[in-house]
Amino acid sequence: METLKKTIRCLDSITDKILFFIFLFLFLIGLYAMYDSFLVYQAANDTSILKYKPDYEGIAPDKPIKGNMVGWLTIDDTKIDYPIMQGEDNNEYLNKDPFGDYSLSGSIFLDSRNTSDFSDDYSLIYGHHMENDLMFGALDHYLKKGYLEKHNKGTIYIDDVPYELTLFAVGESEATNEIIFAPTFADAGTVCSYIKQNALYFDESVKMQENDKIIALSTCKY
């Protein structure tokens, strides 16, 4: 009987140690996940990159990111204020920052099928959906009624020259949509008609002019 009790105590001790190691392991995993999330947030919130932003006179400092940078996007009164990159394919900048380093927050980037000077009738820009309105996480606000009316201006710099943006529609679409996600196969008229018919919100006061271009900002929905 005494031997049995010792065996039980021994097993209890082993079980306690196993549970301790399991909980310690889970705790360490939790710490790493928190640290990893912090690093992702820090990368997406790196305001030091703003020193490479052109000013309204078209003057920008020497940019180590200029090789793959095709523009700069700013949406007024939001946190969207980022360089626009373009890769050889649409996977290149999913997890790469504008300096070419690995980053889970990735970069804001132009569809690889579009021309880099934004001369296409319709261009498509992607960005990760991040918390705290970082990257294209701020686009969530446009799903609220009335938000578009008060936050419909922005600027896109192309070759350091500023062009005014007017946001006129908000919508949701499947990633397989052949009009929205095939930028080089649709002209501005076709895209505009589709958007008008399917948008959640559409500003009827905005009229397309002859040389106007359409630019879509796309992010995932969670």
Model-derived features: positions:
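N-terminal Sec-pathway targeting helices
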Residues: 2-26
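Solvent-exposed, non-transmembrane regions of membrane-associated and secreted proteins
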Residues: 27-222
